[in-house]
Amino acid sequence: MKTLALDIGLKRIGVALCVNKSIAMPLEAIIRKNRNQAANEVKKYIKEYDVNTLVVGVPLGGSSEDEMRKRVEHFISLLDFDKEVFFVDESFSSKNAQELGMVNLKKKDGKLDSLAAYLFLKDFYGLT
C-alpha cells in the first residue's frame, strides 16, 4: 500500500510518500506554473509509485479556511483519482517543518513544503 501526501499551495505543492503505513519520506516538490501542469505532475507521481491513497492537507481555522478548502478540493478533482482521499489539518505543518531546521528558508524550491507534507503524513499514520 502506498500513500501520497500533498501540501497544496498556490506556488508549490509539497509531496511525501508512505509505503505500507510504515516508511515515509519527502519527495521533490512540484513548482506550480498552472493548475493543469501541477495536476499532471501529481498524476505522474501517482502512476510512478502506484499510489492507492491520498492524504491532502487543508488549513483548518482562520478566515480563508473555506476558500482554501474549495481550492484544494478542486485541485484534487483534476487528478481523476478514484481511490481513497483523506483531508487532514495541515495547520502549522510548515511552521513545524521550519522548526526542524532542515531546509534553507531563503530558497523557494519546495523542500519546506514537502517536509510539511511528510510531517502530516507521519502524523496520519502515527509514525515516529
Swiss-Prot record:
CDD domains: YqgF. It comes from Campylobacter lari (strain RM2100 / D67 / ATCC BAA-1060). Its EC number is 3.1.-.-. Could be a nuclease involved in processing of the 5'-end of pre-16S rRNA. One of its GO terms (biological process) is rRNA 5'-end processing. One of its GO terms (molecular function) is nuclease activity. Coiled coil: none annotated. This is Putative pre-16S rRNA nuclease. Keywords: Cytoplasm, Hydrolase, Nuclease, Ribosome biogenesis. The lineage of its organism: Bacteria, Pseudomonadati, Campylobacterota, Epsilonproteobacteria, Campylobacterales.
